[in-house]
């Protein structure tokens, strides 16, 4: 029996795949649990249309992410921070702080999950920060922590 998978099933396929399975497996397990539907003409057309829409949406997401990354890579982002002796920060610069600063400076909403930092930055200096944007877009931006002497 041909079925269209509604959810990912290990060993069989992914959501939207059309698979040939044994009749009993489809009738007694997959269909009653909402894991698959019988592959009718209407269902096949609907799945194809959904795949086309999903691919189109992914292309748009990737293009938008590439534009955001290019915008961020155009400049060195200066981050003012209060420092003590030896260039040590009072506190630390985390991905949350950095996302807020980048969002404010670039005018584009930057999610903290896009910023890949192993640990918070605690000293002044120039840093290469890895970005992982939606759509599989990756790149690095430059961030410079500039000290403001506490007075």
UniProtKB/Swiss-Prot annotation:
GO terms for cellular component: ribonucleoprotein complex; ribosome. GO terms for biological process: translation. The keyword Ribosomal protein applies. It comes from the Bacteria. Keywords: Ribonucleoprotein, Ribosomal protein, RNA-binding, rRNA-binding. It holds the Pfam family Ribosomal_L9_C. InterPro entries: Ribosomal_bL9, Ribosomal_bL9/RNase_H1_N, Ribosomal_bL9_bac/chp, Ribosomal_bL9_C, Ribosomal_bL9_C_sf, Ribosomal_bL9_N, Ribosomal_bL9_N_sf. One of its GO terms (molecular function) is rRNA binding. The keyword Kinase does not apply. PROSITE patterns: RIBOSOMAL_L9. HAMAP family: Ribosomal_bL9. Binds to the 23S rRNA. Belongs to the bacterial ribosomal protein bL9 family. This is Large ribosomal subunit protein bL9. It comes from Pseudothermotoga lettingae (strain ATCC BAA-301 / DSM 14385 / NBRC 107922 / TMO).
């Amino acid at each position: 029996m041909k079925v269209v998978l509604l959810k990912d099933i290990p060993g069989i396929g992914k959501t939207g795949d059309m698979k040939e399975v044994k009749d009993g497996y489809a009738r007694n397990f997959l269909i009653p649990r909402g894991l698959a539907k019988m592959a009718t003409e209407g269902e096949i057309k609907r799945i194809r249309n959904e795949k086309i829409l999903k691919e189109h949406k992914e292309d748009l997401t990737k293009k938008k992410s590439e534009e955001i990354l290019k915008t961020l890579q155009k400049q060195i982002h200066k981050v003012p921070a209060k420092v003590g002796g030896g260039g040590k920060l009072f506190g630390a610069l985390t991905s949350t702080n950095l996302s807020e600063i980048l969002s404010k400076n670039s005018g584009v909403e930057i999610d903290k999950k896009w910023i890949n930092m192993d640990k918070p930055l605690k000293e002044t200096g120039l840093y290469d920060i890895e970005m992982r944007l939606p759509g599989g877009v990756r790149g690095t931006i430059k961030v410079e922590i500039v000290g403001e002497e506490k007075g």
